[in-house]
Amino acid sequence: MDIAKWVEHARTCYSTQLDTKIKVIGVIGKDYPDHGKGDNINCYLRENVFPVAATEDETCTIRGHFSEDDQILFLVMNGVDDVANIRKCLKSNPKSNYFDAMAESECQQIRMLHFLFISCHFIIIFEQTSRIDLELMRFLKKVNSARIQLRKKINQRLVASDLRDVSFNNRILSSAESEGRMVVPRLLIAFQRNNIRPDVNPGKKLQRELYEKLEKNLDNQFSDILKLYDLIDCGASSLCQLNETIPVVHLLNPKIVKRDIIGEMFEILMADAENTKISGNAGTLPSNNSFVKFLEDNFRSEKNEISLENVIELMNCLQCVLDGDLEEKHEKTAIQTFIKRIQNDHMEEARRLYTNAQRPGERRGADRFKDSEKPVKIRSKEEHLMRFNEATHYIDSVVGVNSREALSQLQAQCNEMWQSDMRACESVSMMGRSCVRKIHPTFGDQTAPEHRWTAHDASNTMISTCVCGRKQLIRPEPFSVKEANSDFYDHPDFKCCRRLWRYQFQLYQEDSEEKDDIMWADRESNSLRAAKKMAQREDELAEEDTDLDIPESLLDPDSTSPSDEDDVRVRTMSSSESSSQESDAYLRPTSRRDESMASKTERELTIDHVKRMQKLELAGKSEDFLITVPNSMTTGKLPIFPSWHLTSLGDSSIYSHGAGLKNQPNFKIGGDYLSPVVVLLDVNFDVWNRDLNKIRSEDFSRKCGKDNKDDSARVKLFVGFEYECSRGHRFFVDYNGEPLIYSKGSNVIRESAHRSSLGNVLQADLPIRRPCTCRKLPLQSAQLQKVHVVTPKAPVHITIDPKVLIPTHEGVYGTGQEPLELHHSKYYILHLPTVYSGPSGAWMPGEFNPEKQGVWMGGALKVAYKPVMSFKW
């Protein structure tokens, strides 16, 4: 009978069993002329309880039957898709058409399903086909939405009826999961038909194996579909659940369940005519043993916890769900739903404008594009505001009512999207480009753990040469002065530079640091005594190897000749790597600090520097040192890292003016020659000859010199002002700042002497940046990066004191120290800063400027006579 009538008469009919613990089972499915969903329950009960098909008076109702033997209350729902309901809708009132009648039936079905899913232990779905009905899954999703919407009101009814604390089953639910319902039902599904061939012998074991395999596959498919529609595994938002250990899918055996409907009708008719009882299977139905076992296995998995009396009270309390008393009026709900849908559409379009996403209809065509062609979601603050203004303009144009509320909601959503997943870092590199990463914790960020610290990335690289010029590497754009001027030149791949003497510039040191170790290297490097010790070291090594020049294997013209093309060719092998027999004559002294730094990675060194800076800041010493390039405006302070580098490649015999530079990559053919410079000295010739003979005798004893019969008071140096662009192209310039390239086949010695006579490159003011010799677009600017000096074998005192002027910057950039002393008969390279940063900020020139920028002030290199006897060697 109908559930309302069953509730009304249940207390009277089952008065003796009101305390019996029972289960509540819901049954849903479709009725067909030859088979109804209630037939399978009849087979389980072995009696005709539910009709084969519902009548038109029983459409969209729930039929109830309590089995005293099984202690189960069965609730069978007659739904929208039953044949009787479709027939009824076709015969509907002329004032309402078929579609209106079906819409009303669907609303009632949502209420009935809602009723079942909050009051049944198990719900059995009978599928008359061999496939899962996705339309039913979509319908259940609507039911779940209705349940979530009304759960607070239903919970109030349950509390008012004192049913909230009643134990419904042995499953424990959280307060959120139990709100608005007594139980989360377990779902079972049975298929009336299957795809197994009918000619398979049912008596064979193969048939059962086929059934089990198909059931297992359907079980997995059923679980995936429920998850796809968010019906299970969603916490408090789940509509139902599945048993994890017992199968929930069963294939009915059609040969056993199939009924002869015409035969039954004939027997009933004959029984009425003869006024006799129905014989045979009319009163007792055959049982599908496997289906009965399937149900019993699932039913036994839960204990009966709720009494029949409480179930009757629950059904009576939940009549409000079936009647629709908790729902708002249909007209009001429809209008609100329409308005809300329009608002959601407008907000979705506004979000699409902000994110620059494609409309749903355009996604199919967009799928053929690669991921690299999709719009970049990371945005700077400027881009964020621009996109937000577009979305705001759209909302203003389409929303008339409550536009302020919509704009406030849009602003909150856009800000949340930008802050959470779309905000760009926006840190600017020393070359003027922004970091392309999402906002991230940088080195020293106290709000994030150390392992999350990430370096910036401008998504742009350039090619730079090491201090000695023998190797080039690709480097990312630096984001700090230290990274640009110091860290890169300590790269572990620059092994060629580690083996050379390098001047130790005075750096800021705390009292607790290894000041003695650092200052020892400082004193030893900046004195002629250090040069003498280096010469003595060469003498010791010369006894084993008299040849102090670079090995011939490194002078192979095929490996050192630069290309005439503009394409960048980066050397991956330096001279120190190409031969294991290289002389150790120019090994630089190592300190304890050098050894400790060599064992650490680049990241560890960066973290150590950051922690040191934080320590100095906490100690209030952040103003005691420089984190920029020394400047005349910042006298009295020492830098915390070097921006200038001075190194000695070794003896002056390394350079041969007739052959040019060796092992220096990326020079153009004819562009790897230094400029000879003759310096006249005002000196007493007798003293000059005496000191010159002294130098000669020492050189002869060390087998490093040649006879020099020229006793005139003049000396010759070889100097080169080297420029380098971001592509790694290198070239020298003359006194006018123009590229110095000798044509093929020319006499370099004669032509260079002629060019030197035209102007003194030592006294010339040269540009810091000028156009590169590149012909490949886009054109590049090159920067003065190195000064090469080959000192003569003569009793002279040579110093270099660089001074640089930068446009719009105050003061003069320099080393911040006394002029640097250079020993005679050596090859030196002074490496200039890559980035000039001072009190006026950092200099960030563009990629290309046809004009010359900045000034290297002439007169930085000075040569003076100093008698040898005045030195204490």
Swiss-Prot record:
Keywords: Nonsense-mediated mRNA decay
Pfam hit, one: Smg8_Smg9
Ranges of compositional bias, category Low complexity: 551-562, 574-583
Record-linked InterPro entries: SMG8-like (IPR019354)
Residue ranges with Basic and acidic residues bias: 591-604
GO biological process terms, semicolon-separated: nuclear-transcribed mRNA catabolic process, nonsense-mediated decay
Skewed-composition ranges (Acidic residues): 540-550
Mutant phenotype after disruption: Defects in nonsense-mediated mRNA decay (NMD).
ATP-binding in keyword set: no
Annotated region described as Disordered, given as residue ranges: 531-604
A Gene Ontology cellular-component term: striated muscle dense body
Keyword Glycosyltransferase appears in the UniProt entry: no
Family: Belongs to the SMG8 family.
Function: Involved in nonsense-mediated decay (NMD) of mRNAs containing premature stop codons. Probable component of kinase complex containing smg-1 and recruited to stalled ribosomes.
Protein name according to UniProt: Nonsense-mediated mRNA decay factor SMG8
Protein species of origin: Caenorhabditis elegans
Organism taxonomic ancestry: Eukaryota, Metazoa, Ecdysozoa, Nematoda, Chromadorea
Name of the gene this protein is made from: smg-8
